[in-house]
């Protein structure tokens, strides 16, 4: 992936940054692409760095992701909840699967989506092969993950567990407006040009 460079004028001359480093100076973190251990480590490091720098200022986490590994996503979520800084979450494009959990886990009152964003909630996906006992272990782990994810959705949206269980039985795509009504986000960001 080509990462743009930004040139900034300083008293000492010019300084070149990759765009993500420049955004980090403004307390903006971009979560884009599949959530995996490598991405989680990068996002967690940025959250910890910004919190250590100044824990009285908000951190903005922009999310455009198809989701990914549950344990990686939960590590990001735990860090968001651990740090003192409020974490504002903003869906841009798609916040699907584990990314929707991160979106709704932002600080209450500071969870947003752009007007044309899509949010997808569903049950965890997984597969297993091998001996029957190994398959049973994997199936039990998926059931535990589903219960955990549904409890997070219950806590963050206020929806009854039974409704969440039903609504996540299959892929459930929501518009920004539907995500707001469901309680996944607090507001839809308006067009600043109008």
From Swiss-Prot:
Keywords: Cytoplasm, Hydrolase, Protease, Serine protease. It catalyses: Hydrolysis of proteins to small peptides in the presence of ATP and magnesium. alpha-casein is the usual test substrate. In the absence of ATP, only oligopeptides shorter than five residues are hydrolyzed (such as succinyl-Leu-Tyr-|-NHMec, and Leu-Tyr-Leu-|-Tyr-Trp, in which cleavage of the -Tyr-|-Leu- and -Tyr-|-Trp bonds also occurs). One of its GO terms (cellular component) is cytoplasm. PROSITE patterns: CLP_PROTEASE_HIS (PS00382), CLP_PROTEASE_SER (PS00381). GO terms for biological process: protein quality control for misfolded or incompletely synthesized proteins. It holds the Pfam family CLP_protease. The keyword Nucleotide-binding does not apply. One of its GO terms (molecular function) is serine-type endopeptidase activity. It is found in: Cytoplasm. Its EC number is 3.4.21.92. CDD domains: S14_ClpP_2. The active site is at 97 (nucleophile), 122. Fourteen ClpP subunits assemble into 2 heptameric rings which stack back to back to give a disk-like structure with a central cavity, resembling the structure of eukaryotic proteasomes. Cleaves peptides in various proteins in a process that requires ATP hydrolysis. Has a chymotrypsin-like activity. Plays a major role in the degradation of misfolded proteins. Belongs to the peptidase S14 family. This is ATP-dependent Clp protease proteolytic subunit. The lineage of its organism: Bacteria, Bacillati, Bacillota, Bacilli, Lactobacillales. The gene is clpP.
